[in-house]
Amino acid sequence: MPANFDTSMSSNVQTDITIIGGGIAGLWLLHRLCDAGYNAILLENNALGSDQSVASQGMIHGGIKYTLSGLLTGASQAIADMPGYWRKCLQGDGEIDLRGCKLLSDHFYLWSSTTTTSRLTTFFASKATRGRVDKVTGQQLPPLLQVPEFRGAVYKLVDMVLDVPSLVRQLAAPLQSRIFQIDWKTAHFQRLPNGCHAIEIVSGEQRRQLNSSAIVLTAGQGNAELLKQLGATSPTMQTRPLQQVLVKHRHPHRFFGHCLGAEATPRVTISSHACHDGSQVWYLGGALAEKGASQGSDELIHCAKRELSELLPWVDLSNAQWATLRVERAEPLQRNFARPDQAYANWAGNCQNVIAAWPTKLTLAPNLATQIVELLTTKGIKPLYASPPALALKTPDIAHPPWQTLFGDN
């Protein structure tokens, strides 16, 4: 401690659970813990939802896109019921009330070009997908595809799309007194004699030692640095990079859909997001974004223009604005850097009271919270403290979506 530090301004504060990371996973967990009676708080060093959460397309899907190889995978089976689960929350009948969250679309489409139509038809005739998809034709087609030039097949999925900033706002609003902005330049972990960790927070002349029965890391890519600071021996994190493409235009039709290609990953995934100036952004993911991770921005934009001109040649994007966004999907390490099938949470090695957690996809944030509550229960960690600790820290802002930042649409 510096010689001029006034020890009279030092104090210990207690809470049951401290969550580090204010994305969807951390905010969802905060709700679940408070509902279970825990005195929980959340610390975020940036804006709530920043990085991976707001970079998401907002899809709540039931895994159909993971079955495009023709097989039911662990990923597909793990999340088959998630659209229904989230839908109950949006209706106010689930474990968290999300009635104020903006729903961008209550369905998602899967469409094919003429060259892949037979594959799509054969697959969706199987029992594996029965009740989860419906074929649409004629006037049932989305307006974007109601043109003579379109000759592919279209299926309507039970998946839905949420406005992620709206979701973050809805989750954060009821619990603002428990959400704090932390500056890791003036805060650090302390290893206690019993092997547990506390967090020392310096604010002005005040020093607080925040003691918690458990610390839960839900900081996405930031978990790696936090685990390093803690001296944790496990788990190890992997990242799988993407480079998404954003197209700002004034074409009238909103669209949410996957285009089936020759690979297991959709050729391109399109979600639509309104801008304040009346235009909209098509946010492009799928194989285009996965392959785009190794490309420069200009090269990827050229590929995206070619893809859209092949798939939707009747859409005039000649006056559109284009941009790209690099995204790192943070996950627990898998063999051959494969995509994880399920949410992950476990106690960190060499840390008595630290859990490392990754939802691995937006859809599974509720599953992650359930896993963490079970870990706490199994270890016998029960609610002990009544009210949130007094921390002289401000409440973080809500992160802006990437199209607002990239196109100046704030």
Task: Describe the function of each predicted region.
Residues 1-17, 35:
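Extreme N-terminal leader/targeting segments of oxidoreductases
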Residues 21-23, 45:
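Glycine-rich Rossmann-fold phosphate-binding loop(s) that bind the pyrophosphate
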Residues 34-55:
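Glycine-rich FAD pyrophosphate-binding loop
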Residues 58-143:
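Dinucleotide-binding Rossmann-like beta1-alpha1 core, especially the glycine-rich loop
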Residues 101, 138-181, 209, 287-288, ...:
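Helix-loop-beta segment of a Rossmann-like dinucleotide-binding subdomain
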Residues 154-214, 218, 222, 366-373:
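Helical element adjacent to the flavin cofactor pocket in flavoenzyme catalytic cores
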Residues 158, 166, 312-408:
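C-terminal catalytic lobe of FAD-dependent flavoproteins
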Residues 217-352:
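Active-site substrate-recognition segment that forms the wall
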